[in-house]
């Protein structure tokens, strides 16, 4: 009887130990996953914020190019001259500006390729004539479907604005360049207004079906937002120009989980967004999961061996007890 109680106590102690280790392992795995989630989200938000600053820096550099040429043009006797048009051609050739134009006070634009057009009704021209550096609303090309904006600076002569110098910049190519090496070029980028109008997009079409002019909030309205995210909060962030991140899912398909990080560009009311599958964002942490799997399998194997050893040991003890009971002590 004493031996039986001893075995029972031993089994109970082993079960308590195994349960304690199993609970600890579960807590460890949950905490590890939460840590991976936080770190991957932090990396995405940090990179999107940096790329937003990069966009402003690049456009500021090109504003600087335009200012320098506008200053030289302001020194000439005539606004539109062969010498000034040659500077426009050089500006287009030496910078990322795809088309440059010198605009007279009446709105007549003289382009570097020799074309002429009246742009007196355009906002960027009106703001330029008011002495402001201006950035136009985005326009999608009917030829290559790329989105471009016009950067404009005033041309001053003797302190008076006599015209506007403008150059077009491909913001689709810019967003592509910024995120080309981000998570091995997986996912896609969006540039939107604070109202959610999509003005530029780029990325692998396997991950999105967005078109120019779509509304950001309408596009994601039928998506499931997880981890406490809501489109109402995102709309508020867009209106305030705040940064944020949400996790989205197609219905109940966990394999479709994506992170969407966004931040203010600091130009007009633009927001830049980056969308990437969660599996890709957490890819660099796969080695942690491999170690977790190895540890879990190893722990399971050890528990199984311990259990089998206990069963064998218990059977051996029972066999010895039966033999002892059946043996005549006097023989």
Where are these regions (language model features)?
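Extreme N-terminal signal-anchor transmembrane helix of membrane signaling/transducer proteins, especially
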Residues: 1-38, 297-301
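Cytoplasm-proximal transmembrane signaling helix
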Residues: 18, 279-321
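Extracytoplasmic/periplasmic sensory segments of membrane signal-transduction proteins
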Residues: 42-51, 57-136
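Solvent-exposed, extracytoplasmic
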Residues: 80-96, 164, 168-218
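Extracytoplasmic/periplasmic sensor domains and loops in membrane signaling proteins
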Residues: 85-86, 112-140, 206-248
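Extracytoplasmic/periplasmic ligand-binding sensor regions of membrane-associated signaling proteins
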Residues: 94-96, 105-181
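Extracellular/periplasmic juxtamembrane segments that couple receptor/chemosensory ectodomains to their
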Residues: 217-293
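Conserved nucleotide-binding and Mg2+-coordinating catalytic segments in signaling enzymes
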Residues: 322-331
């Amino acid at each position: 009887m004493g031996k039986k109680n001893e075995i029972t106590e031993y089994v109970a102690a082993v079960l308590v130990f195994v349960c304690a280790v199993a609970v600890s392992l579960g807590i460890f795995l949950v905490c590890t996953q939460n840590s991976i989630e936080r770190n991957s989200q932090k990396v995405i938000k940090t990179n999107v914020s940096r790329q937003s600053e990069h966009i402003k820096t690049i456009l500021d550099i090109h504003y600087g190019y335009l200012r320098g040429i506008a200053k030289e043009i302001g020194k000439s006797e005539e606004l539109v001259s062969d010498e000034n048009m040659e500077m426009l051609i050089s500006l287009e050739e030496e910078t990322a500006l795809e088309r440059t134009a010198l605009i007279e006070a009446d709105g007549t634009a003289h382009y570097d390729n020799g074309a002429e057009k009246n742009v007196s009704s355009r906002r960027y021209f009106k703001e330029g004539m008011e002495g402001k550096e201006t950035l136009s609303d985005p326009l999608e090309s009917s030829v290559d479907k790329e989105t471009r904006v016009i950067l404009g600076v005033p041309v001053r002569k003797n302190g008076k604005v006599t015209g506007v110098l403008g150059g077009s910049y491909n913001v689709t190519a810019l967003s592509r360049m910024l995120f080309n090496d981000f998570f091995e070029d997986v996912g896609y980028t969006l540039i939107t207004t604070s109202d959610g109008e999509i003005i530029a997009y780029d990325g692998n079409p396997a991950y999105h079906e967005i078109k120019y002019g779509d509304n950001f909030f309408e596009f994601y309205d039928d998506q499931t937002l997880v981890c406490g995210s809501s489109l109402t909060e995102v709309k508020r962030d867009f209106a305030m120009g705040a940064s944020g991140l949400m996790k989205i899912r197609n219905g109940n398909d966990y394999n479709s989980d994506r992170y969407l990080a966004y931040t203010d560009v600091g130009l007009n009311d633009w927001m830049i967004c980056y969308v990437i599958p969660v599996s890709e964002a957490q890819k660099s942490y796969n080695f942690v999961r491999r170690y977790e799997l190895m540890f879990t399998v190893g722990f399971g194997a050890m528990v199984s061996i311990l259990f089998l050893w206990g069963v064998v040991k218990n059977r051996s003890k029972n066999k010895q007890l039966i033999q002892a009971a059946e043996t005549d002590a006097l023989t």
